[in-house]
Design a protein with these regions (language model features):
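N-terminal secretory signal peptides and thylakoid transit peptides that target proteins
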Residues: 1-18
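N-terminal Rossmann-like dinucleotide-binding module
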Residues: 17-87, 166-169, 261
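Glycine-enriched catalytic-core subsegment of oxygenase/oxidase enzymes
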Residues: 38-39, 65-66, 70-73, 79-80, ...
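Predominantly a Rossmann-like dinucleotide-binding segment in NAD(P)-dependent oxidoreductases
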Residues: 52, 60, 156-162, 166-275, ...
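Short acidic-hydrophobic, aromatic-tinged amphipathic segments that line or gate anion-handling sites
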Residues: 91-95
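Short amphipathic alpha-helix with an adjacent loop that forms part of the alpha/beta core around
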Residues: 99-105
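N-terminal Rossmann-like NAD(P) cofactor-binding module of classical short-chain dehydrogenase/reductase
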Residues: 110-111
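Beta-strand-loop-alpha-helix segment that lines the small-molecule cofactor/substrate pocket
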Residues: 115-116, 120-168, 182
Length: 493
């Protein structure tokens, strides 16, 4: 593999840091020299910059009001107006590049909660400058971007956190502890779902081209994506449903719902993946989709073997079959989704964020705690990590050493859906970030417009397709985007 550190290596390092330092339930910093730990903590408040503050960013910032928020940026000043008013001492911007040019060297940390497609370029610049980073989920828009942020964070030894707040909650810890203690036995199948999307998907590109509002910096919103005319269907909020800007229900919610799966089963790269959906359009994510990930066997734990496992994802109203023994009337949807772990001894069910886990047998076993207990909020756990010396830092609950590889898995599902027209199971080489079984001459196309109509009781099917493109090249662009001119990521460490 050469000089590059593998995803498996990063994951093992992250797991060791997050679990191995805190095996004693009563001590957050077990195994760390107390005097050295105290010396490493910085006094005073963090100076924080916020990018993307009108939506999820507002909630994140409210959890950071113990610190000094010195600069705020949002491309939409109408949407962000209440947040600007809440922090009157922070300088205001509508272009993060301008804010970074003026304030990046003065800050300690950056919060990023912009549209998905700009997460990587904002976070990468901040990390390369040695700044701590909190980034909303999904961490990035592509596999390559996730790998880059993982390696940059390790290189620059900054504290990081992805905004999947369930990672700091009790449900994920309980799920991991039960599974790691062997309570449900070996797991070879997991099914998960969300009730999303709750934003528009399955849309064609709008024909209307209204004027850009004076309060919106459209060029900054587009960022590294290809330029297109403004339409209010894209932003705010609705970016999630458009391929150029978002990752659909899978990207938006799997970072919450699949996190206990990734963590408890110590997943690494999938080796095989396939996706299907309702009508697949070239511009917008489908209304409903199913993805199957296959992961190879992992190293066994003392009380648990880790065989090959299939993980299934459903969204858009689709759900897995109810497990045998689940009482009638019990809703698997808890806080927006659910997960079913099928073990050889029992079945474990939990909700979105890992919430309210239970065993189908009704047992409530008392087991050793092998996870660090997070007594702070998700944001404040990151603040704690920011203020610790890198040599003794206990990683936050969703540090990029774990969140980066995890997000690769999530956006791999998005790629599989977009490649479903190949009509094959896709084989994945995680180290190289490439598919190994797409034929060299394979082509792929997608629907631009669905011209279905009914006249006098007779249906007409008249779809307009994109021109066929080489499937390998198309897949490569989904894995590593070609940014538009003027936008560039740092080199991969």
């Amino acid at each position: 593999m050469g000089k590059e550190m593998s995803r498996r290596s990063f994951l093992k390092a992250g797991t060791a840091a997050a679990i191995g330092l805190s095996m004693t339930p009563g001590s957050m910093f077990a195994g760390v020299d107390a005097k050295k730990k105290k010396k490493g903590v910085k006094d005073g408040k963090l100076k924080i910059l916020g990018v993307g503050i009108g939506g999820r960013g507002a909630a994140v910032l409210r959890g950071l009001e113990t610190e000094d928020i010195i600069g705020l940026c949002d491309v939409d000043w109408k949407y962000a107006a209440p947040i600007f008013e809440r922090y009157p001492n922070a300088k205001k911007y509508n272009d993060y590049k301008v804010m970074f040019a003026e304030l990046l060297d003065q800050c300690d940390a950056v919060v990023c909660a912009t549209a998905d497609h700009t997460h990587a370029i904002i976070c990468a610049e901040a990390i390369a400058a040695g700044k701590h980073v909190y980034c909303e989920k999904p961490l990035t828009h592509s596999v390559y971007e996730s790998r880059l942020l993982t390696k940059l964070a390790a290189k620059h030894k900054v504290a990081t956190q992805m905004g999947n707040q369930g990672a700091s909650a009790e449900g994920v810890r309980q799920t991991c502890n039960w599974i790691w203690n062997g309570e449900i036995g070996e797991i070879t199948k997991v099914e998960a779902f969300t009730d999303r999307p709750i934003w528009p998907q399955g849309l064609e590109r709008p024909a209307e081209e209204p004027a850009v509002p004076s309060t919106l910096n459209w060029d900054a919103f587009i960022g590294p994506a290809p330029m297109r005319p403004y339409n209010p269907i894209y932003t705010p909020w609705n970016f999630r449903g458009w391929w150029d800007f978002g990752t659909g229900a899978l990207g938006d919610m799997a970072c919450h719902i699949l996190h206990p799966v990734f963590k408890a089963l110590k997943l690494t790269y999938p080796t095989k993946i396939q996706g299907s959906s309702t009508l697949l359009l070239s511009e917008s994510c489908p209304n409903a989709q199913v993805v199957k990930f296959t992961f190879p066997a992992r190293d066994n734990m003392p009380k648990l073997a880790m065989p090959e496992v299939d993980v299934y994802w459903y969204d858009g109203g689709l759900k897995p079959e109810r497990p045998a023994g689940l009482p009638a009337g019990v809703d698997l949807n808890v806080q927006g989704g659910g997960v079913i772990f099928y073990g050889t001894k029992d079945i474990l069910v939990c909700g979105c964020y890992g919430a309210k886990p239970y065993l189908l047998s009704g047992r409530k076993p008392e087991v050793p705690n092998l996870c660090r207990e997070v007594t702070l909020s998700h944001q404040q756990d990151w603040v704690r990590a920011c203020k610790e010396d890198p040599e003794v830092r206990v990683p936050s609950a969703s540090d990029f050493s774990e969140a980066g590889p995890f997000n690769e898995m999530v956006v791999m599902g998005v790629v599989a859906v977009r490649l479903q027209g190949l009509n094959q199971e896709l084989h994945w080489d995680g180290e190289k970030m490439e598919f190994t079984n797409i034929p060299a001459d394979a082509t792929i196309r997608s629907v631009i417009k669905d011209g279905f109509s009914i006249k006098d009781g007779h249906p007409t099917f008249n779809k307009t397709y994109t021109d066929p493109v080489n499937a390998r090249q198309f897949a490569a662009e989904l894995i590593k985007h070609n940014y538009r001119e003027g936008w560039e990521l740092p080199a991969m460490p």
